[in-house]
Every structure is written in structure tokens, then in C-alpha cells.
Amino acid sequence: MKILDQKGKEFLLNSIRCINDFPKPGIVFRDITTLLNNKEAFNFLIDHLAARYEDANIDYIAGIESRGFIFGAALAARLRLPFVPIRKPKKLPFITLSQKYSLEYGVDEVQIHIDAFGEKAGARVLLMDDLIATGGTAKASVELINQTNATCVEACFLIDLVDLKGSEKLKSLTKIYSVLEV
């Protein structure tokens, strides 16, 4: 599977706005809206991901609410694959499976429709999100996919905040690909 070269990484990184001290002091927020608003950068990213996954024998692409929907749905459309949303509680209208995960000061949860990957066990799923930080949501999402008897073959992120070690939480569950590591 293809990995982006340094020139491509710099192009994408330069298309993402960094906002200091948002949402609180000491945080550098990676604002992907500038990448989304740049048709060359957005299409470059989706082209790269399509080239990486076109021969990966993937059956579905799942995206984590909400920015994972953007990249996941765009990639699914490009690869002509079905897209499955992984959502926050009480957002899906049909019967759901749930996975709770810990936050710094509490617990949150992700959900998926019970029939999201069809009747056949063993569907091969690519999980997409814009960013991995501490890894709690991504880990819960992989576990949720596994609850459906599908297999998360890889988790893909536009950005990995490596100092927060979120990818470390996933390594025992699935392969990980981050386009950019910051």
C-alpha cells in the first residue's frame, strides 16, 4: 500500500490552518476546513487514499462522527464502496450496537447500526477519521466494528498527534496509517 512522499505531506500540512490556544490554552488546533476549502489539496488527499486502498480488498469504509464522515464518504464514493457512519449516542434510528470509552473526566460512547455491514460475517472494513489524539474514540470504534463480526483491517487518519500516543492504543487491534504525523 502506498505511503505519501515528503513533498505531498508538506503540501497537505501547509493546507491545514493551525490555531494556537484553541479550544483552551496550550492546545494547537488543526483546522481541516482550510484543506476542505482547497480543491487541489482535498482532491490530492482523496486521490492518495484511493491509490493506497484501491487494491486492499476492502468491503466497507466506516467513518467516525463527524469529520471522519467527510473523508470516509469521499473515499467510499471514489472507490465505489459503501460508507458506514459511526455515531454518537441516539443519532441512529435503527437497532444499534454501542461501545463505551473513557474520557479524561467521564465516559462517552459510539454506536453503529446492528446490520451496518450486512449479513455476512468477516466484512473487511477501513476505519477513517480526520485525527487521532488519545485514541479513545478510535479504539472504541474498532471494538464496535469487531462486535458486528466484521474486521477492521486498518484505521486511517489524516493527522496523528504522536505525542498523545493514541496510535499506541490501536496497534494491538488493527493496522494504522496516518497521512501526517505532527
UniProtKB/Swiss-Prot annotation:
GO terms for biological process: adenine salvage; AMP salvage; purine ribonucleoside salvage. The keyword Transferase applies. It catalyses: AMP + diphosphate = 5-phospho-alpha-D-ribose 1-diphosphate + adenine. CDD domains: PRTases_typeI. It is found in: Cytoplasm. PROSITE patterns: PUR_PYR_PR_TRANSFER (PS00103). Pathway: Purine metabolism; AMP biosynthesis via salvage pathway; AMP from adenine: step 1/1. Belongs to the purine/pyrimidine phosphoribosyltransferase family. This is Adenine phosphoribosyltransferase.
